[in-house]
Amino acid sequence: MLQLLLAVFIGGGTGSVARWLLSMRFNPLHQAIPLGTLAANLIGAFIIGMGFAWFSRMTNIDPVWKVLITTGFCGGLTTFSTFSAEVVFLLQEGRFGWALLNVFVNLLGSFAMTALAFWLFSASTTH
């Protein structure tokens, strides 16, 4: 149990730092769409799709790696709370179109990235 807790802790910290670095680098590039948050959510969605595909096929992987990558890293990297706050900020500024676009791009993009990764990595592990 302690190993699993440490895996979540280490993965979560690493994912959070990665999200912060993405936000610092890419959020200033566009005034209405926080590109760093979007990148974090899309990358995290892809990684979790890849992880679930691999873990469903490769049942001998240590559970520590599973929670480190999915619950830990992807949980720290992706962010629904920051995304929600950024949408509310856009709404408060009266930028309703940008807020709606932000919602659609984050949600649909994340679903698409998870599905793509799951499909790609399920196909690659069937050999």
UniProtKB/Swiss-Prot annotation:
Among PANTHER family, the record links this protein to: FLUORIDE EXPORT PROTEIN 1-RELATED
Question: Any idea which positions bind Na(+)?
Answer: 75, 78
Q: Where in the cell is it found?
A: Cell inner membrane
Q: Where are the transmembrane segments?
A: 4-24, 35-55, 71-91, 103-123
State the protein's name. Fluoride-specific ion channel FluC
Q: Which keywords does this Swiss-Prot/TrEMBL entry list?
A: Cell inner membrane, Cell membrane, Ion channel, Ion transport, Membrane, Metal-binding, Sodium, Transmembrane, Transmembrane helix, Transport
According to its record, what are the GO cellular component terms? plasma membrane
* Keyword Lipoprotein belongs to the record: no
How would you summarize its activity regulation? Answer: Na(+) is not transported, but it plays an essential structural role and its presence is essential for fluoride channel function.
- What does this protein's UniProt record list under function? Fluoride-specific ion channel. Important for reducing fluoride concentration in the cell, thus reducing its toxicity.
> Could you tell me the superkingdom of the organism this chain comes from?
Bacteria
Species name: Escherichia coli O81 (strain ED1a)
**One biological process GO term for this chain?**
cellular detoxification of fluoride
The reactions it catalyses are: fluoride(in) = fluoride(out)
Give the signal peptide range.
Answer: none
Which family does this protein fall into? Answer: Belongs to the fluoride channel Fluc/FEX (TC 1.A.43) family.
What InterPro entries does the record point to? FluC (IPR003691)
Instruction: Give the bilayer topology.
Output: Multi-pass membrane protein
Q: Write one Gene Ontology MF term.
A: fluoride channel activity
